[in-house]
């Protein structure tokens, strides 16, 4: 059988129908063979019908839950680590950088136009350089570069937002620039909006409740955007100047 894993779902097709099977025979593919754990991610296949002469599988049913998602940790240089459960970790080699360190991660589903396959993309940006890494499995990586006019020499942050049912957007900001870079296709191509943020200094950003929110550490300034392109600045109370990071939770 050929197995395709998408999120928590498996999709199976017959590779070789075999011989000498009978109806209601059951086969098991170990979860460890398809990127998960045994027995939690095993696939149980039930033979529904066979060729009356050869016993080759004609039709089958299957059940099983795929391992969906993993933890990814990033660090200096090419150093990273992944874990399925947060307990056991495996070293992960990230793409090499000419300078700087990988510093910010975001992930989100990408709509590929079908009803069943919606691949997840994890995107990593580095501080001090314009290199961006992206992957659908946090194992095999590709790299791309932010637009040349984007000043990536500072602290850079990426966040993901589902803007509409058809627009899945990654947004990158830097505390060295007012411009905002964004991609709607998982990093394949990038767009830039000039002078989108109220000022430089915005180095932390999060998406939640339908908005991107960025903060300017050490000041009382924050900004928000529903699409990551058009931003509105706001002034927070004086105690806000001590804030250094932001997260959204529900």
Stretches found by the model and what they are:
Residues 67-73, 113-124, 164-172, 210-214, ...:
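Entry beta-strands of beta-propeller and related beta-repeat scaffolds
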Residues 99-109, 152-162, 199-208, 241-249:
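Repeated scaffold domains used in trafficking and secretory/extracellular systems
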Residues 83, 135, 183-184, 225:
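Conserved Ser/Thr-centered positions that define the repeating blades of beta-propeller domains
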Residues 1-66:
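Conserved, function-critical positions that sit in or immediately flank catalytic
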Residues 56-57, 87-90, 139-143, 187-191, ...:
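Beta-strand initiation motifs
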Residues 94-98, 146-150, 194-198, 236-239:
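Surface loop/turn motifs at the tips and blade-to-blade linkers of beta-strand repeat domains
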